Amino acid sequence: MTMSDDTPNEVNHVDIDFPPKTADDFFRRGLKSAQLGIPDKAAADFEEAAWLAPENHDIQFNLGVAYLSMADFEQAINNFTKAIELKPGVADMYGNRAVAHAAIGEDEQSEVDVAEAVRLGAPPDGLGAVIDYVKEQRK
């Protein structure tokens, strides 16, 4: 058995820097960046992917998550809303949008999304704890 001379970091770096051409390429690179905690780079790749495949709910959802992690709550809401329009009935989409609404003080909209997320299977205690934390951070 032979071992590669590449360290794991070098391998991951190569995987991320390949020249993307398709929506899937940009999406996969965005996921890698998100996993590495680089939300701005993830968002840039997800934006490219969304340009190439605007009707892909996974891209819109992950774009929303990237913006949520960068505290761009209005943009996150826009992307979660688009994801919901493309594929209604996914608890995580409503739950994340609820968090974004709560972060900017839109408590009524947040409560509506929390109720829908819970109806679709989100754990009420977990989502409630996140919403409470976000509201505390607003103060």
Regions found by a protein language model. Give the residues of each.
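Alpha-helical tetratricopeptide repeat
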Residues: 1-139
